[in-house]
Each structure stands twice: as structure tokens, then as C-alpha cells.
Amino acid sequence: SHPARPDEGYRDGEPAKDLFPADQLADHFPRLRIAAPLKISDQPRVAAGSRPPFPAPDQPSFYPKLRTMLIALLLAFTATINAQTLKTVPYRWKSVQMVGTGFVDGIVFHPTAKGVRYARTDMGGAYRWDPKANRWMPMLDWVPFQDLNLMGVESIAVDPTDPDKVYLACGTYTNRTTPDGAILRSSDGGRTFKITRVPFKFGGNENGRGNGERMTVDPNAPQRLLLGTRHDGLWRSDDGAVTWHRVDTFPSTGGARGAGIVVTLFDPASGKPGQGSTHAWVAVSDAEGPNLYESKDSGATWAPVPGAPSGLFPTHMILGDDEALWLTYGSSPGPSRMNAGAVWKLKDGNWTDVTPEKGSFGYVAVSVQEGKPDTAIVSTFGHPEHEQIFRTTDGGKTWRPTIGGKETYDYSKAPYIAHTGIHWLFDIEIDPANPNHAIFTTGYGGHETFNLTDADKGKPVIWHAMATGIEEAVPLQLLSPTKGAQLVTAIGDYGGFVHRNLDKPVPEGNFINPHFGNTTGVAAGDQAPDTIVRVGVPSGNSRAGNIGYSLDGGKTWQTTKTAPPGARNGHIAVSADGKIWIWSLSSAYRTTDMGQTWTPVTGLPSNPRVVADHVDPNLFYNLELFGGVLDTSRDGGATFTGKSFTLPGGLPHRGGDRMDARAGQDQLYPTPGKADDLWIAAFDGLYHSADGGGNFTKLPQVEQLHAFGFGKAAPGSSVPALYLVGTIDGVRGIFRSTDGARSWAIINDLAHQWGLVLQISGDPKKFGRVYVGAHGRGVSYGDPK
């Protein structure tokens, strides 16, 4: 088997300070990213009785290190020349407060250290709890674009003997085109990480992502870890996750319809500190064959646990203080649909079915109270009435429901969830340091209570929104109106918000009337910013309509009287005076009476994306980038005329690292404050026309682009500030120009990269303010320091 290799270190996104020469170079060139040589202490090494690392080093050699150092220095020299043309403007970054807006699929408490806990998400990184700030803190904002796969976190493990050590198994998808995953290890509570690349993939955003935990630390030998994978079997590390080797004696990789190995667990009572645990269990997502295995010889051999249930997929497993093993099961790994489930308990070799309630739903999580092993809670998935949390105080003999009765909810920290049904409770945890404190996760974040034991007294349990600091939205469009609200966000799954205070959750919640799932387009008139129009698709089974508009800057909303036939999703353009709206679908439709009537637009190809000029209310455009045609309307969008154009160096080609078609690349951007002034933000370059598209010039420094936007002009300047996400002069980052793209300044640092950035927009009301929308990491806003 091929062991994993350690290769990189990060400190809040910066190269680790003990890696030469990256430490010295990073001090002088903060945007420079160098693949630093391995530390000697991190070199793969051969353990007795194991297969040698691949490639197997015969002896330590000076020459590979020298070669690596020379390459790094050459790269640094090249980057130095490029960096001389780029200024750096330090920015202060904060998250726009939406709170949650995505699936938190796992919570991990440290078993002995009070206040130490972590949260993982399916595509938005991982978080550590900060008890002083009383909020979650992102741990992976340093992840660069080239490593965006690491933003999906498959599993988290903590060292029971050291509250500062935490491990993350990172990787979003297991498909053929996605890179292999990595194990991130930290010795300071997730503030800094070192990376070990592994020769297999993780599926942080795939079916079964709420199962777990797949990775665990031996409490009696904390340098030893077990890791379950989706398709590549069981892996083990004996050096604190620096190197990994496949456990070839483990007999299963998981069923064809399952999610691989979903839980690994050591038995602390089977060993002594410093000697290691001899007994361990592994649960496999398999409903057709054996799905629970154990080893009683420190992992040398494995065998199915006698009498274990079959026919369902294990979802969670936990060991109580009394050596009782609790498991939950469903008819799928989830969050695909479940129509059956069970809860089982193994104690003293005897299996007992302790399912609280049978039905056409599954069970997905279980937690046992520290010090009281007969007290446990379990959560359901797919319950026909509403999701449920059952609680027992007698080891599963009897259960009481805790949802749908006397409980109350405090939505003040995330008002939008008041009308978002509780769903996807794939983890539920009782705080080992406080039996009154429990957390359950959801598709929008989660809830926590501080009076859980009141349920045993028949008193109401109060559940509070618990996701402050966690921001998982996928921004599909960002709008900063010329006056009024600071920002309007169009996001996936939860519609979007009108933000008047970026540092507090929106008190009225997300968009309603209509309430969208995905908002795919939002626009306002530059000269009439109180007129805001949004399009998308309603959430759930709602029939509220696929378009909403506001005439008071987003304070209130209403639906149009009519809509084009079959209209849903698409994009919306609003004329500069707010009176003409054009809805781009498979074809385009136009209204001049706020949606009472719609007429087809003529002269456009299929699947257009019409945009409005920011000055002339009768002027609209549509870009056919790959065909080299610019469609223009000067009659208020009633008819369009196409005209061919050329670009210096030729038209762009499809393909490349575009990553997500919803990003702001390959689009046309009319300039605020100037009619007939256009920018093409293509993936492979930035182009400008000052004559309505008659002629385009290419901006020479821009090599690659993912997002583009405008902001308020700098003091004394007549041109709007430009903001760009991409690569300029060989440097990848977030950039600002205040002189019409003649020069650029870098405005982000290595601690703020957010994986894949989809959208960027400046603020027309405040110079320097910029909004950055990242894939699964919400929206951040920046101001110059």
C-alpha cells in the first residue's frame, strides 16, 4: 500500500515558520505560496512490520533537499519580480452575519476539557468554539483556491489526552476529477495546521457525510489513530497522523450502496496509558453483509461482531462508561431518504433492540451522558410528522420525545430559522462537562440547550440557535445598492437577506413573500435603488411564485401578478430608473408594469443573460462570449441587435479551472456612472470597451479571473474602483484597482482565501468596502485597515 506523505505546514494560512526557506520568503512576500521542503521530523519512516513508505527512501539524502531549496528560491525570485508591480493594501475581514445557512454534519466535544469542541461542515470548512468570544471561529479560511477540495471536512478527531490536538480529514468529493484528500493536524487547538496528503479521496459533501466519526485517537496511545475511508478501507497512523498505512487485514471497504467505513472507535478499558488499547470497533456502511467489526489484538486481525444487526446501514456509534456500545441505523446512509431505522445496544456480548419508535424513518445519531451511561438521546431522520429527539434515563427501556411538546425555541441569534423546519439532525451530542448542555445539528446549523435535564422533570427544554460564527451560504449574486441597505445577498438553499447591519443577523430573517430556496438573480436600479427585484425558486412545496420585488429598498416584498410561462430561476435585469425588468430564462421576457404583463424579447439567442446599463434606462446588453457577439437594445429591451466583436488574442475557450458556472466569470459588466462603457470579465482575461462594445482592449496583467465587481471611486477619482478575484502577474488573490485597471493592489492575505470565491462586489456608498462570496463559506466583507 502507498502510505501518506506529509508535505506542508500552515499557520492561519501562512507557511509554517520552521520550514526553510518558505519562512524567510513569506515574511517579505506575504502573497507568495511556496511548496516548502519537509521537516526532518516529518519525513515518512518505516514502522516495524509495516510496508515501507512510498517512495521508500534508502537513506536520508542531502541532494533532494538542496534541489527543493533551489527550486523554491527560483520561484521566489520570479514572484519577486512580479510582486514589484503589485501593491499591497492591508484589509480587515469579517463575516457578514447570516448564521449557519448550511449543513453542520458533525460536532466533536473533547471528552475532558471543558469548552473545547469543534464543528465540521460538508463544504464550508471546520470551526472551533471560542468560549471567550462565545462564537465559532473558522479554522480553514486559509485554504487557497488550488486546495479548495479541503473545504469539505469528512471527520474530526481529538486527542483525549491533549485538548490542544485536533485532526481533520478533508476532501469534498470522491469523483474521478477531484484530487486526493488530506489529513490536517494541529497542536494548538486548530489555530495552525500541518498537512499530510493521503492517496485516497474523502467525500465531505457526499451521501453519508453525517455519519461518524470516521477518525479516532487511541486514548491509551494518542500517537495511534484509525481512519475509515469511503472506498479504500481502514487506515492507521502510529505517529500522530504524520504518516498513514492501510490496514490490509481489515476485510471490508463497505457495501456498494453505502458510504464506506463510517465509524472507528477504541475501547479505553482495553489498555493502559502508554501501552495502547487492544480492543477497537469499526462500523461499515453496508446493509447486505457484516457491518460491524472488532479487533481484540490491537488491530492485527479483525472479525465481524457476533449477532450484530443486519439489513440496515450503521449511522453512528458510541461507547458508554459502562462498556455498552450504542448504534443507530437507517435504510440509507443519509441524507438520502430513509424509510426504516433502529437503535441497538451491545453490552456484555448481548444485543438489545432499544429502538424508541418504529416507523418509516431512520435513526442517525446517539449520545450518552458522561457518568450516567443509562441516559442517552437519539435523533431521527425522515420522521413523517417532524424530526424527533428521544431521551432515555433507563438504558433504553423507555423513551420520551423531546420535540413537538413543551420545548421552546430561541431564534434571536438566527431569526430566519423561525420559518425553516428542523431537519437533518445527523449529530446530537451531550456535553461531557455539562449534562444540561446538548447540541443537535441541522441543515441550517443547529440548536443547543442548557437545561436538557428539565425534560426528565416534565419541564420545557429551551433550544437556542447555536451557529453564531458559522457561515456556510453559497452566494449566487451580491448586490450593494447605491443607497439604502449595505448589501443584498442572493444565496442557495435559504434565499438571501437584506443586510442593513453587517455585524448582526437580519432581524426580519431571510426573503419572504415569496420565500425562495435558491435566489438565482437580484438587481436594482442605480437611479432607483429602492426598486429591487429577485428571481429564483420557492423552497419546499411552496407555490408563492418565482419572482419578488420591493419598492422600499427591501423592507417589504410582494409577488408579481403574473409571470412568464414556466418561469423559474434565471437572471433579472432592472433598468437604471427601475421601470423596466427583463427576466432571462431559456428566452427573455420584459415587463414595464411591475409584472402585471410580460412580453417576449426579440433578437436574443437561447439562454441569454441580459444586463442593464447603469446610466441609460433604455440600454440593455447580452453577451455571447464564446460566439463573439454582443447583443444590444436601445429601446428599453424590447428588441436586441447582435454585432460581432473580436478580442485581442482571440475569443476565450471553454474549459480550464472555471470550477463553478455560477461564479462571476465569463460575464459582461456595464460600468457604473458611464453609459456604453463595458467590461468583459472572462475566465482567461479582462477586457474593456469605452464605445459600447465596438472595440475591446485587454488588460495585460490579468491572467485568470473568477469574479469581478465595482465599488465607490477613490477620493479624487472619477472611475469606480474595480475588484477582481483571480491571478494577476502570476499571483493569485483578491485585487483592487482605483485607476481603471492600469495598476492593481492585493487586498487579501494568506489567512483569508476561502477556497473558491464565486462573487465579489464593492460598495458604491463607501470607498474601499468590498464583499466576497465564497463557495460554502458565506460572505465576508473587507475594509482597509
Spans of model-derived segments:
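Beta-strand-rich domains and repeat architectures in extracellular enzymes and scaffolds
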Residues: V96-G124, P432
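Signature of short aromatic-glycine-proline-rich micro-motifs recurring in repeat-based ectodomains
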Residues: G102-G106, L150-A157, G208-R214, G258-L265, ...
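Short glycine/acidic-enriched loop and turn motifs that connect beta-strands
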Residues: G124-G125, T172-T177, D232-G233, D286-G289, ...
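Conserved Ser/Thr-centered positions that define the repeating blades of beta-propeller domains
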Residues: R128-D130, P160, S186-S187, S237-D238, ...
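Surface-exposed loop and turn segments in beta-propeller and other repeat-based domains
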Residues: D141-D147, R197-E206, F250-G254, P401-H419, ...
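Conserved blade-ending motifs and adjacent loop-strand segments that build the rim/top face
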Residues: F361, Y409-Y416, A465-L478, N513-T520, ...
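Loop/turn-rich, solvent-exposed surfaces of beta-rich toroidal or solenoidal domains
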Residues: H423-H437, T441-G446, P670-A690, F696-G740
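Blade-level signature of beta-propeller repeat domains, shared across WD40, Kelch, NHL, RCC1
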Residues: G755-K785
